[in-house]
Amino acid sequence: MSDSNMVASWSRLAPRLLSVLRIVGAFMFILAGTSKLFAFPAGIPPDGGTVELMSQIGLGAILELVGGGLLLLGLFTRPVAFILSGEMAVAYFQFHFPQSFWPSINGGAAAVLFCFVWLYISAAGAGPWSLDAVRRK
């Protein structure tokens, strides 16, 4: 198989890989929310507890759980991903950035990554394995 044929065959997987990126990212995002809200699968440091529900971090955890669930299903993907991208930008600049410029030092690498993955998905859409795709038919 020539290089151009391999690239062409790999490129055909792009829509499905977009769905995989959305699904895996959403699952990880849900886990971030459940850790904060229910201490599952583990609580938040330093004591392994949960956050105050009526706090800014509590609101973020609700967005992670509900928004992550919608993204997992691929439902209302573009607006939800855009909102969650903004949430992660706020989380980074408000909580991580003041500690250090570098995400690897300030603990904000996941927030930066989620911010840009959700921003991309808000532009690219949910992919073929989604309720949005079913609703379009």
Question: For the regions a protein language model found, what residue spans apply to each?
Answer:
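Alpha-helical transmembrane segments and their immediate interhelical/interface regions
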Residues: 37-45
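Extended, low-polarity transmembrane helix blocks
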Residues: 1-38, 54-62, 66, 73-137
